[in-house]
């Protein structure tokens, strides 16, 4: 019997694929890959939903995750990806948008919601920022530092270990070559960067195809 699994990707503009006019971001690359495998394969299908919203923090995630999961729930199983932190850790008007402890609590709450629909849950690391925007107030009025990225990624790693979740380490994949993998704004990947993210993620979705 044909099996249909849903992959739900929650996140911000990096999940959505902003700044990639070529591929449309890493999830669109994965979507094309999954479609190709379906057409070549045994009838089972993995359907991917890009649920990224630009500028979203974990506060926004908590408002919508119960409804989104309810609306997209496959009887054959779901895979849930949570990709947050780049907006949470930003400092705006002298205040951190979502402080580390609150970030940890929000991700934990989101994971508890996700658990009602899936045992296949992945936390996605925050990417490093370009040196040119590290500690700099940009046009949006936000200031981000690579120091904070390390702190928030550690929270994600610890939660993944504590709750037996997957952890996708895009941070390490980007670190050495970040200046050529990030777009001109120093925060979002360019098409090369999104391609690199897809390369890291394909082996993960491969087991569900």
Regions found by a protein language model. Give the residues of each.
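Alpha-helical cap/lid subdomain in secreted, periplasmic
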Residues: 2, 43-44, 60-209
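Serine-esterase "nucleophile elbow" of acetyl-processing enzymes
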Residues: 1-54, 59-60, 66-76, 80, ...
């Amino acid at each position: 019997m044909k099996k249909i699994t849903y992959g739900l990707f929650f996140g911000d503009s990096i999940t959505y694929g902003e700044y990639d006019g070529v591929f449309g971001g890493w999830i669109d690359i994965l979507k094309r890959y999954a479609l190709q495998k379906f057409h070549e394969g045994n009838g089972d299908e993995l359907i991917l939903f890009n649920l990224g919203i630009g500028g979203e923090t974990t506060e926004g995630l908590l408002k919508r995750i119960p409804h989104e999961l309810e609306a997209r729930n496959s009887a054959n199983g779901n895979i849930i990806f949570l990709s947050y932190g780049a907006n949470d850790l930003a400092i705006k008007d002298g205040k951190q948008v979502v402080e580390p402890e609150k970030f940890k609590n929000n991700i934990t709450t989101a994971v508890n919601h996700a658990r009602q629909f899936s045992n296949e849950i992945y936390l996605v690391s925050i990417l490093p920022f370009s040196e040119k925007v590290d500690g700099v107030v940009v046009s949006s009025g936000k200031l981000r530092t690579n120091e904070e990225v390390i702190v928030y990624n550690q929270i994600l790693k610890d939660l993944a270990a504590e709750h037996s979740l997957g952890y996708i380490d895009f941070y390490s994949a980007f670190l050495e070559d970040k200046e050529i993998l990030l777009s001109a704004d120093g925060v979002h990947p360019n098409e090369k960067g999104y391609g690199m993210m897809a390369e890291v993620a394909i082996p993960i979705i491969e087991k569900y195809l």
